[in-house]
A protein has these predicted regions:
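Hydrophobic (often cysteine-bearing) scaffold residues that line and stabilize catalytic clefts
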Residues: 10, 37, 44, 98-101, ...
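Short glycine/proline-rich turn/loop motifs
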Residues: 82-92, 115-118, 196-202, 260-275
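Functional-site microenvironments in short loops/helix caps that host divalent-cation chemistry
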Residues: 129, 133-135, 139, 143, ...
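Short, contiguous alpha-helical
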Residues: 24-80, 115-162, 166, 174, ...
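Short Gly/aromatic-enriched secondary-structure transition segments
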Residues: 221-223, 234
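N-terminal regions that are enriched for targeting/export leaders
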Residues: 1-26
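Acidic/histidine-rich alpha-helical segments that form the ligand environment
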Residues: 6, 73-120, 124-128, 209
Length: 333
């Protein structure tokens, strides 16, 4: 079935994302808000075992009872959890045990789908699990990025792509009339509860930039003293800046001889002027927008602007395989 094929593809893609990593990489935790790759691999499996297999598989037996606590994240309704800041201490189970756990649950779930594939409630649970796992695919990469950024060897998760060659287009503005607009999920496909219901909201007229802010533009903000000017920052953002001694984006580094390098999943690379700036905090993005004489768009403004392009904006299931760093759209520089 289509659902069975999607299940296999999503699970295989998670394994593919982990494939370039060593067992040591998969166990490390760089900060309390991050999780080890091994934990992501196990937790996404725990989700299917707990919420799909346990209530639906005849004679259900857990792969390993202790995993119910170790790999629960925050689902209080199904029991206790291992403390998030201590996930990096889980040197056991070994990575090989977690991969065996994944294989076991996958085989059992596919057998369940073969028997009960027309069960609408079961289909909905599996779909939720797939959406959940795809979220963790993104989290896995962001956690690897933070982990590798703290390594003095500056390791690359993937070989560097060719640099962006096209010059950036002049920033222009696309105007929107605003008014009463429909937002929220309104189709028959999957949605999370916070995307519902579809409803009407009022938007004042607004405009969006025709391309992303690039690294050269953000470097100009830094050069102009952007991190030293309190009038550009929200009060909470300025407090964060001072408390953490923030002087530039998290993954930017001073290059020998001047200028900047930017650390990413392709390792440490020279700043690419026309490449989109990424990995900013909300406070940094807000301060830049104020410096540039603009502001950040609201969620509703983004949704209304993107709605006519929705089919083209849907990422293919293997998008993270083809491109793991933000890039400018064709023709925009």
């Amino acid at each position: 079935t289509d659902l069975d094929s999607r299940f296999s593809a999503v699970r295989a893609h998670t394994a593919l994302l982990a494939a370039p990593l060593s067992a040591e990489d998969c166990c490390a935790q760089s900060m309390p808000d991050a999780s080890p790759v091994k934990w992501h691999l196990a937790h996404t499996t725990w989700f299917f075992e707990t919420f799909v297999l346990e209530p639906n598989e005849p004679g259900f037996e857990p792969f390993r009872p202790a995993f119910r606590v170790l790999f629960n994240s925050y689902y209080n309704g199904v029991g206790a959890q291992h403390p998030r800041p201590q996930r990096g201490l889980l040197t056991r189970p070994a990575l090989s045990d977690v991969l065996a756990y994944r294989a076991n649950v996958e085989q059992r779930l596919q057998a369940l789908l073969a028997r009960q594939g027309d069960n609408a409630a079961l289909q909905a649970l599996v779909e939720l699990g797939l959406q959940h796992e795809q979220q963790h695919q993104e989290l896995l990469l962001t956690d690897v990025l933070h982990l590798f950024s703290g390594n003095p060897l500056a390791p690359a998760y993937r070989d560097a792509p060719p640099p962006v060659a096209a010059p950036a287009q002049v920033q222009d503005w696309l105007e929107f009339a605003g008014g009463l607009c429909e937002i929220g999920h309104g189709g028959r496909g999957f949605s999370f509860d916070n995307e519902l219901p579809r409803h009407t909201t009022y938007l004042a007229p607004y405009a969006l930039g025709t391309r992303l802010v690039n690294q050269a533009e953000f470097a100009a903000f830094i050069t102009d003293g952007g991190y030293r000017r309190p009038e550009l920052w929200l009060a909470e953002g300025w407090d964060w800046l001072a408390a953490q001694y923030i002087e530039h984006p998290l993954y930017w580094r001073h290059a020998p001889g001047g200028g900047w390098t930017v650390f990413g999943l392709h390792g440490e690379q020279p700043l690419i002027p026309q490449a989109p700036v990424a990995h900013l905090s909300y406070f940094e993005a807000d301060a830049y927008a104020r410096w540039a004489g603009a502001r950040l768009p609201t969620e509703a403004e983004w949704e209304v602007a993107a709605a006519p392009l929705a089919p083209a904006l849907l990422a293919p299931a293997d998008a993270l395989r083809a491109r793991i760093e933000p890039q400018a759209a064709p023709g925009s520089g």
